[in-house]
Amino acid sequence: MSQTNSHGEAAGTAKPIGLLIAAVGVVYGDIGTSPLYTLKEVFQGGYGVEVTHDAILGVLSLIFWSLIWVVSFKYMAFVLRADNQGEGGIMALMALARRASAKHPKLQMMMVVFGLFGAALFYGDSMITPAVSVLSAMEGLELAFDGLDHWIVPMALIVLVGLFLIQRHGTARIGVLFGPVMVTWFLVLGALGVYGIMQSPEVLKAVNPAWGVNFFIIHPGIGVAILGAVVLALTGAEALYADMGHFGRKPISRAWFILVLPALLLNYFGQGALVLGNPETVRNPFYLLAPGWALLPLIGLSTMATIIASQAVISGAFSMTLQAIQLGYIPRMHIQHTSSDAQGQIYIGAVNWALMAGVILLVIGFESSGALASAYGVAVTGTMLCTTILVSTVMLMLWKWPPLLAVPLLICLLLVDGLFFAANVPKIFQGGAFPVLAGAVLFILMTTWKRGKQLLAERIDEGGLPLPIFISSIRVQPPHRVQGTAVFLTARSDAVPHALLHNMLHNQVLHEQVVLLTVVYEDSPRVPAAQRVEVESYGEGFYRVILHFGFIDEPDVPAALALCDLPELDFSPMRTTYFLSRETVIPSKMDGMARWREALFAFMLKNANGNLRFFKLPFNRVIELGTQVEM
């Protein structure tokens, strides 16, 4: 998911079949590996469902119609249309919903809350997906070799740690294999499913939704609860939307209906047919569906598929972190570009090591894919519900859909998502607390950072000197001017930056050209070069420059300044000096945030990556001035 620009460019030039194969490799890894554990979890997950004819057909019917309603209908028909200038993902959707609700501040705040909580849960999902996927693939070895039970966890850890260790080197070289491997995976899923269905074609009756309704009637006490296991078939549905900016809506939709959906349904029905004929196979219906001679090759293919699924989720966490940083919800971090050809391939070390630590703890703590499955559904359904709420706002307030048409539809979508989420709430006390706690911690961090930055800006602005008054004083009492251009980064456009005042106080000089630079991040993913720069001259050698970036643009300030069209402004490297202000926060009893949040914000600010690296400023042309601010 980190290959934003490369895929975005490919979307316009690649042949449809090549783009479809690439989409299968990146988008469908997570949902494509769900057959490894979904049906097993339904009957072995402690829900009390007996392996009977009616129960098997009922569960298959629920899986079938869940995939049709949630993925084929909700995501394909509606969510994928809610693109933010071609970009998808919950952060892009939150920016879109925030724009749609701009005239309603309270509603806008709610959209931000849902967007941030959905994003926070996605990070929890980014830890669970690699753990449960690789564990479920490795568990096939228990069937192939006796006495390997105790080696499953160590082998899974070796694979997962290796996966995280190679992230800094990028995946461009091996990434070309993802598509062909996943296409092979889905073809094998379909073939195994057909093989199983041929043994007991009766399972095809489950296409009739009456079997699903009948399941609820027969199992009134666990009917809704079983949706907590059925939802495992939908894990990865959010990736369809998140990766839309990489491939476009049409290739993702075509891949789903042509290959992925048929393969998944055939495999689930094949597993159901196997269990229908031999209830003992419910202990691992996916692997037992394969002929004995095919078991080891299938384990190898499963391991590759789960690694690809894990890679997509890890890359997705990098991409979403970049969006969140540029929207102002996460402190700036060092971002490493892992490919000279594809600008969008990135690596963020802090995120990588945090995810690796979380994955290791999950594998050691839960030890099996079955135990981990209980933690999985909470993150998935929570993110899906947040997405539906955000899309609802976009449909009603941005697209202006007629309420008579939109409201009943949205009620149905929210009802289904609400049922899935409610079914997973009890799991919070059975292992599902991990993604909720991780999400809550990340939500607190993001909201603390955003609020802290707002308060910091307010404190700095207090008593600030208005720019017109400062320039007037320069005219009356001109200071000594030195050659070159001084660029002062500032968040405000109407006041004198503290760094400029400090420079005047200590050095008693001004440069010939003084540029007050403000960087603005828009709610759109990209800003065209023609709209990148705003320039205004104040006279006396003072200029106001505003640079506009999208939330996936690379903020290269020197390159953007080169786009200025005023001939008198000279930004040549050896004549330009950048002045930065570095604030140190001192928590106090002043109004604002709770003391513990102020202390947390101060810690985050101290450890955040500075403007120098983030804006790609030349190291030897930067002067940083510190200031202390009470909050």
From Swiss-Prot:
Q: Pfam families, per this entry?
A: K_trans, K_trans_C
Transmembrane portions of the chain: 17-37, 56-76, 109-129, 147-167, 174-194, 215-235, 256-276, 288-308, 346-366, 378-398, 403-423, 428-448
Q: Which reaction does it catalyse?
A: K(+)(in) + H(+)(in) = K(+)(out) + H(+)(out)
Q: What is this protein called?
A: Probable potassium transport system protein Kup
Query: Which species is listed as the source?
Result: Pseudomonas savastanoi pv. phaseolicola (strain 1448A / Race 6)
Q: What is its main location?
A: membrane
Q: Does the keyword Cell inner membrane apply?
A: yes
Q: Which InterPro entries match?
A: K+_transporter, K_trans_C, K_trans_N, Kup
Role according to the record: Transport of potassium into the cell. Likely operates as a K(+):H(+) symporter.
The Gene Ontology terms for molecular function here are: potassium ion transmembrane transporter activity; symporter activity
Family, according to the entry, reads as follows: Belongs to the HAK/KUP transporter (TC 2.A.72) family.
User: What membrane topology does the UniProt entry give?
Assistant: Multi-pass membrane protein
GO terms under cellular component: plasma membrane
Keywords, in A-Z order: Cell inner membrane, Cell membrane, Ion transport, Membrane, Potassium, Potassium transport, Symport, Transmembrane, Transmembrane helix, Transport
Report if keyword ATP-binding is assigned.
no
The record's subcellular locations are: Cell inner membrane
* Domain of life the protein comes from: Bacteria
